[in-house]
From Swiss-Prot:
One Gene Ontology term of the molecular function aspect: pyridoxal kinase activity
Keyword Membrane included in the entry's annotation: no
Protein name, entry field: Pyridoxal kinase PdxY
Keywords: ATP-binding, Kinase, Magnesium, Nucleotide-binding, Transferase
Coiled coil: none
Family: Belongs to the pyridoxine kinase family. PdxY subfamily.
Entry annotated with the keyword ATP-binding: yes
Residues reported to bind ATP: D111, E148, K181
GO terms, biological process: pyridoxal 5'-phosphate salvage
EC identifiers of the protein: 2.7.1.35
Gene from which this protein is expressed: pdxY
Binding residues annotated for substrate, in chain numbering: S9, T44, Q45, D224
Domain of life (superkingdom): Bacteria
Quaternary structure, from the entry: Homodimer.
Length: 288
């Protein structure tokens, strides 16, 4: 069994961060060692919540504890998501350094969660700068959305060609795989009823589209689900393209179930059979 140290947010109610990623990854046969960066009552897009940011020292202590019982050599990947402070970025890098010492083949997937002007997504000051300065140079995989891609590269991105230039800039900095979630108005198809996503590697760029469900309130945690299931499929031995397609069909099933149930929260439990055996078969097209 493959193991992932997943360092991201936790919500008591609902599905975001580790709550969104853990169960689907376990369904796919990958164990998740969940280490929380924050513990909130619910995700921040409700507009009100309670809870706390986990002190950065606690992350280091937990990682050291895993090393003390000689378990870091069993860690196949590090996954990072929502961070509660810029200082936590340093602890992510500490965790990566320790894991790589024990298992040089371990992967690092960085989901660079950043504040969004149209969403109540509260991210601490300095996180963006710390991710750009410290995470990009060491990440094997990054999974930004379109807004986060703009912030990471500081490129103006309005067209599909702009997206390609931006992802190639990240690849040039050493990131081996870049997934850009929900291209929106910068998509290749640019249809409001279509969800578009790309995967870029040094070997090329692949594009995939599927229906975009029109929720009254867009569920949170979809990016966490995408990052987690893509990583799980890679660890299960699938090729880049196979993992990209599998993830998209698994996530499509979760979104379909969530929409049909009229839920604001992702319905990963209700959609468990869609994760295990997706009913859709969307395929990726190489576009560059």
């Amino acid at each position: 069994m493959k193991n992932v140290l997943s360092i991201q947010s936790h919500v008591v109610y609902g599905f975001a961060g580790n709550k969104s990623a853990t169960f689907p990854m376990q369904l796919l046969g990958v164990d998740v060692w969940a280490l929380n960066t924050v513990q909130f009552s619910n995700h921040t897009q409700y507009g009100k919540w309670t809870g706390m940011v986990i002190p950065q020292e606690q992350i280091r202590e937990i990682v050291t504890g895993l090393d003390n019982i000689e378990k870091l050599q069993e860690c196949d990947a590090l996954l990072s998501g929502y961070l509660g402070s810029a200082e936590q970025v340093d602890q992510i890098l500490f965790a990566l350094e320790q894991i790589k010492l024990r298992n040089p083949n371990a992967l690092y997937l960085c989901d660079p969660v950043m504040p969004h002007p149209k969403k109540i997504c509260v991210v601490a000051n300095g996180v963006r700068e710390a991710l750009i300065e410290k995470a990009i140079p060491v990440a094997d995989i990054m999974t930004p959305n379109l807004h986060e891609l703009r912030q990471l590269t500081e490129f103006p991105i309005n067209t599909f060609d702009d997206v390609l230039k931006a992802v190639n800039a990240l690849i040039a900095k050493g990131v081996k795989k870049v997934l850009v979630k929900h291209l929106g108005s910068a998509g290749k198809i640019n249809d409001p009823d279509t969800f578009e996503i790309i995967m870029a590697t040094p070997e090329g760029v692949w594009h995939l589209s599927r229906p975009l469900y029109q929720f009254n309130f867009e569920p949170v945690g979809v990016g966490d689900l995408i990052a987690g299931t893509f990583l799980a499929n890679l660890l299960n031995g699938k090729s880049d393209v196979e993992a990209f397609e599998a993830m998209n069909n698994e996530v499509a099933g979760v979104m379909k179930t969530t929409f049909e149930l009229g839920s604001y929260e992702l319905q990963t439990i209700a959609a468990r059979f869609e994760i295990l055996n997706p009913s859709s078969n969307y395929k990726a097209e190489k576009v560059a």
